[in-house]
């Protein structure tokens, strides 16, 4: 009993209580995000959209105890894994939002409130009829631009080359973003380039290791909010 009540205390502290609209991952317009209430402090704010099993965010949060981290994930099993990893690593600076990312960006986060936002290995939705479900789109980029501070950083990675090209196209066309690595990695086949070197803060996750074993390499992109 003690163990489960301790776990429930951790859950209450780490998992945000979000007002819902329709579903259990929706975010009502009255939702708020007050870092002082949530973390007990104002600090450098990192948001990961689609934190999966939590490997990337827990690793970085342990390296940067002075920063506030928000993991956004819809799937309960992923959140359970993430909470376990947080407990094992003893990190106190991560909070978890079980929420649809577009609604969270629209309804919960303030304008110009985020220093760094990550989208690592989002679902590629391979079938062309499903491409409209892909997260990174012009409309999603608008939402990210609203919450990022001027000078804020958007880091992206995918192991699907075709999706990487789509991400780059979306962000190159967006008036509020500039590529941190313009022209980098350009080739004859791909004269535009603009690929980021692998960011040292992004740990090698089990997901990426599987992609490597299948012969797919990660494509990184880094953009700055103008």
Set out the residue ranges of the language-model regions.
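Single conserved hydrophobic/aromatic residue that forms the stacking wall/gate
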Residues: 1-7, 11, 160
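Class I SAM-dependent methyltransferase core
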Residues: 48
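Glycine-rich SAM-binding Motif I of class I
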Residues: 54-55
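Conserved SAM/SAH-binding beta-strand->alpha-helix loop
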Residues: 75
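S-adenosyl-L-methionine
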Residues: 83-111
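A short glycine-rich, Lys/Arg-flanked "PGG" loop and its adjoining helix->strand segment in the class I
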Residues: 136-150
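Conserved beta-strand signature within the Rossmann-like core of class I S-adenosyl-L-methionine
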Residues: 150-158
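Class I S-adenosyl-L-methionine
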Residues: 169, 173-226
């Amino acid at each position: 009993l003690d163990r489960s009540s301790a776990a429930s205390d951790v859950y209450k502290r780490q998992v945000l209580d979000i007002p819902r609209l329709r579903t259990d991952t929706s975010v009502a317009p009255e939702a708020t995000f007050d870092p002082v209430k949530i973390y007990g402090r104002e600090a450098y704010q990192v948001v990961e959209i689609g934190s999966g099993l939590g490997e990337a965010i827990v690793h970085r949060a342990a390296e940067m105890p002075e920063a506030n981290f928000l993991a956004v994930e819809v799937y309960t099993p992923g959140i359970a894994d993430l909470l376990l990893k947080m407990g094992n690593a003893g990190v106190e600076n991560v909070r978890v939002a079980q929420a649809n990312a577009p609604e969270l960006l629209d309804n919960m986060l303030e304008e110009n409130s985020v220093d760094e936002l990550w989208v690592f290995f989002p679902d590629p939705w391979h079938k062309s009829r499903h491409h409209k479900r892909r997260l990174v789109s012009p409309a999603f980029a608008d939402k990210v631009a609203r919450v990022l501070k001027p000078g804020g950083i958007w880091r992206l990675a995918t192991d699907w080359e075709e999706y990487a090209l789509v991400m780059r196209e979306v962000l190159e066309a967006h008036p509020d973003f500039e590529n941190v690595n313009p022209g980098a990695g350009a080739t004859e086949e791909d004269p535009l380039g603009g690929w980021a070197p692998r960011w040292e803060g992004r740990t090698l996750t089990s997901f990426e290791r599987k992609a490597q074993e299948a012969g797919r390499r990660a494509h990184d992109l880094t953009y700055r909010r103008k």
